[in-house]
Amino acid sequence: AIMNNLKVKSSAAYRNYSMDAVEIHDAGGPYAAKGFFYRDMKMDSLVPSDIVAWDESGISDKVLDSFEKTVQYCKKNNIELVCVTSPITPTTSVNGYSEQAGAYFTRLCEEYGVEYYDFNLLTMDTLPRTDDDFFDEEGHMLGELADRYSDILASVLLDKCDKSTAFYGTYAQ
């Protein structure tokens, strides 16, 4: 372990803050850039996660203050701010917590005049997906789904899709 640490820390990649210097054994796929691991391995089952029940009171004033400052900065500098919730596994998204979180962020963004999209509400026709398209219950997508989602995200943000048919109106649908 010591020799490996010396080898890594003396490399040009490490000195230049490159991810190439980091060995990550449990990422599920190669590092693709900008914090993205292209996970392509199918798992026998999802990596379990400790899913925490949604609790609005757990959002600190500091976080809300940071959000407000971000909104103010964007408005002052004529920057369009769009907030999104990326999709998680279908099984996890229907447990009620996603719906509660989505309702909270919908209200918060409406209060500040910020556009918000909950991509858990994408129809299955728009983005076909199953739990098998994810690495874990938290919503880390396998690469193929991440590619498809990125295309849909871009089409929504660029206003190139019919949002009235791309999204379900409620989680019950």
List where the protein language model places each region.
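Short, local alpha-helical segments
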Residues: I51-W54, S86-T92, D131-D136
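Secreted/periplasmic serine-hydrolase-like ester/acetyl group-modifying domain
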Residues: A1-K76, T165-Q173
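C-terminal regions of proteins
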Residues: N95-Q173
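Long, well-ordered mid-to-C-terminal structural blocks that present hydrophobic/aromatic surfaces
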Residues: V63, L81-P90, F105-T106, D159
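Active-site segments of SGNH/GDSL-like serine hydrolases
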Residues: T70-G96
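Acidic-and-aromatic substrate-binding clefts and catalytic sites of carbohydrate-active enzymes
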Residues: S57-V63, P90-E99
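Short amphipathic alpha-helical segments, especially helix-boundary/capping motifs
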Residues: M43-V47, I79-V82, D125-T130
